Amino acid sequence: MNMRAERVGEQMKQEIMDIANNKVKDPRIGFLTITDVQLTNDLSIATVYLTVLGNEKQKADTFKGLEKAKGFIKSELGSRMRLRIIPELNFEYDESIDYGNKIERMIQDLHKKD
């Protein structure tokens, strides 16, 4: 990823977080944290990685709500960011947090056995 895509991704991360938490009124969208935004070099596609606080049903509901609000989020991004074309948004669950928690639990279990 080039420098411009990185800078735009960081700004998009902040803006999407604000839009999802403050502007989108869908009750299905729970407490979410956007961990990263990866853009293609031509800025046409943005993969938004996020984590959701809650169980599997709440995660699924949040993703359904985000898919439904995708057009609204893109229009808000268009008014907030100075880009010629607003990238297509793809939302994906960031499993690195869960993986890190699993490793942390395993390390704690090893220390308890000693």
From Swiss-Prot:
PANTHER family: RIBOSOME-BINDING FACTOR A, CHLOROPLASTIC-RELATED
Keyword Cytoplasm: yes
Name of the gene this protein is made from: rbfA
Main location: cytoplasm
Role summary: One of several proteins that assist in the late maturation steps of the functional core of the 30S ribosomal subunit. Associates with free 30S ribosomal subunits (but not with 30S subunits that are part of 70S ribosomes or polysomes). Required for efficient processing of 16S rRNA. May interact with the 5'-terminal helix region of 16S rRNA.
Protein name, entry field: Ribosome-binding factor A
Entry annotated with the keyword Nucleotide-binding: no
Any one of the GO BP annotations: maturation of SSU-rRNA
A Pfam family it matches: RBFA
Keywords annotated in UniProt: Cytoplasm, Ribosome biogenesis
InterPro entries from the UniProt entry: KH_dom-like_a/b, RbfA, RbfA_dom_sf, Ribosome-bd_factorA_CS
Family statement drawn from the similarity comment of this UniProt entry: Belongs to the RbfA family.
